[in-house]
């Protein structure tokens, strides 16, 4: 496979998608692998450092229907399938996170707890009022948070096994991607949907305090896209995917953004493995995974 170098320069786009950069340095991403179209609506990928393996959620057919044909794949970090249908019996799994040697997956209105050692489902925590549980993240206490994009809500599985609504506020602006840093949760907002998943004003990054649930925008609150995955870059900024427009963005603490990659629509919940300098992105509509080296 030929390797493609992507050189990212400072750009400014005017209008509602305001994308600028505070960085003067050139950023280089090298495409290192891309799978064939072998997945079934892959939504999220997460890295298990302990086992040096990736897990990929496959919605399979319909993200809103309880069809029972969703699954989770096990994949090597060089893009090779280890077990395509490692976990079965899911409906439409989306966000993934790992805590205390368990894998958690959102599944429409449920949070699924999986024993990583065996691949067996341990628990299904149901939130009857939830519509579209999306990304999921764990705090340092082992509590699990899940975004319900269409109800402007965050659910939490606490330390005693209670899964309930933790926060409901329109200021979340359709929360999608979640990333926990200490006592803060970084949220990739989709923006207020006006017709299905379309928006007049796209979303930006939000910060929610895990202490007092206060909500604020990251930096200047410029609309940047219909945000999906959010991961830290290790230097105070974030790699973020725009699902609708198929973009990889680099968002600074002041809210300014650099366009890193033009991908295809459906760029979903990415994983960033800092120690390997690797970014892995599910291309949901293309049924592929693609990986880039940070140079």
Give names to the regions the model predicted:
Residues 29, 110-111, 116-141, 147:
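Asp-box/WD-like beta-propeller blade repeats and closely related beta-sheet repeat scaffolds
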Residues 74-77, 99-101, 156-162, 179-183, ...:
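Flexible "stalk/tail and boundary" regions
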Residues 30-35, 80-86, 120-126, 162-168, ...:
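A short beta-strand motif characteristic of beta-propeller blades
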Residues 38-51, 57, 62, 67-69, ...:
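Beta-rich, blade/repeat-based domains predominating
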Residues 75-79, 115-120, 158-162, 209-213, ...:
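Short loop/turn segments that connect beta-strands within beta-propeller blades
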Residues 8-18:
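Bacterial N-terminal signal peptides
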Residues 70-73, 110-112, 153-155, 204-206, ...:
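A short loop-to-beta-strand structural motif that recurs across blades of beta-propeller domains
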